[in-house]
Design a protein with these regions (language model features):
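Hydrophobic topogenic segments
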Residues: 1-50
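Structured C-terminal helix/loop/strand segments within mature extracytoplasmic catalytic/sensor domains
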Residues: 46-67, 71, 98, 161-166, ...
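Short N-terminal helix-loop-first-beta-strand/juxtamembrane motif that initiates sensory/input modules
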Residues: 71-81
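Short, conserved catalytic-motif segment at the N-terminal edge
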Residues: 83-96
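Active-site SXXK
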Residues: 98-123, 147, 202, 269
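Short, well-structured active-site flanking segments
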Residues: 115-131, 217-221
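Acidic helix-start/capping segments at beta-turn-to-alpha-helix junctions
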Residues: 124-140, 146, 163-164
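Mid-domain, small-residue-enriched loop/turn segments at the edges of structured enzyme/sensor domains
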Residues: 143-144, 158-206
């Protein structure tokens, strides 16, 4: 997956020039109908949302039309300018609709395992047990970085099993991850099952992750960040994770979430697409990279 994204970046860089990010004029106000108000940053809470929808409210947003990047596929895109506290959103209704995170959950599965001491920044290789998978890159020992890049399910399933339900529930609740519903089973609660999250929440979580709002070990935050590295591009350093959800043998849910670091700013983003068969992590990453080159 990483190779596909890097190749797409090179193709776009070859024919697209940089364009300035649109300027915003309003002041950000993010309010949730709970007892707690975080004036310094956007936040989320399960009490303010239903299982299927996240109630995101903010004045400092700009709606943009990116339909040409989706080629008829239903989807949404959220970009958060962390330096200026600004949002750009395509398809606001879908940006708050919660769907399965699929492999994007691995960002936090790895982080929780680090916090639990199951793996460490310096020691995170796990041995392949010999099970033959249809994806060749899974059929080998994995580190946190290679497992993230190869999206090796077995690696993160092992981490979750060792972390265990009680700790996982505690961590997901602590960071406010979507609906925090792990009832679908420890092996696949994240794969078109019970755990759901919206693109808007994905972006907020990434911002919280980079600021280490949760007070985790900074070394663990850095280890996950390093594992998410994709490439140095002409517009900045790109980090991210794809996700693909399938139903009845067809790819119906595609994710690409991550952040782009420039010399002066960090942009967190999430792209999700829904389709009867054409949505995938690779399609989402291709669209997101193209959008980033257009906007930044």
């Amino acid at each position: 997956e990483k190779k596909v994204i890097v190749q797409r970046i090179r193709e776009i860089a070859a024919y697209k020039s940089e364009s300035p990010l649109r300027k915003f004029r309003s002041v950000c106000v993010l309010l949730l109908s709970t007892m707690v108000v975080y004036a310094a940053s956007p936040f989320l809470t399960a009490n303010a949302s239903t299982d299927s929808t996240y109630h995101f409210s903010g004045e400092n947003t700009e709606s943009i039309n990116l339909s040409s990047h989706f080629n008829g596929t239903n989807g949404s895109f959220v970009l958060y300018d962390t330096a200026n506290d600004h949002y750009m959103i395509y398809n606001e209704d879908l940006s708050t609709q919660r769907v399965s995170p699929d492999s994007t959950f691995k960002i936090y599965s790895g982080l929780f395992a680090l916090e639990e001491g199951i793996i460490s920044a310096d020691s995170n290789e796990r041995a392949w047990d010999g099970t033959l998978y249809s994806i060749d890159s899974w059929n080998q020992d994995q580190t946190l970085a290679t497992a993230m890049q190869n999206s090796a399910n077995w690696y993160f399933q092992e981490l979750d099993e060792q972390t265990g339900y009680p700790a996982l529930r505690g961590y997901y609740t602590k960071i406010g991850y979507g609906n925090c519903d792990l009832s679908g089973g420890i092996d696949d609660y994240w794969a078109e099952s019970t755990l759901k999250i919206s693109p808007a929440e994905q972006v907020i979580l990434l911002s919280d992750f980079l600021r280490n709002k949760w007070g985790f070990d900074p070394e663990n935050i850095q280890a996950v960040k390093d594992a998410l590295f994709i490439s140095n591009t002409d517009i900045g350093t790109l980090y991210g994770k794809t996700g693909t959800g399938s139903r009845n043998g067809r790819n119906t849910n595609g994710w690409f979430v991550g952040f782009l670091e420039t010399d002066e700013n960090v942009y967190c983003f999430a792209l999700n697409m829904q389709d009867s068969g054409g949505a995938s992590g690779s399609a989402a990453s291709e669209a997101a990279v193209s959008i980033l080159h257009d906007l930044l």
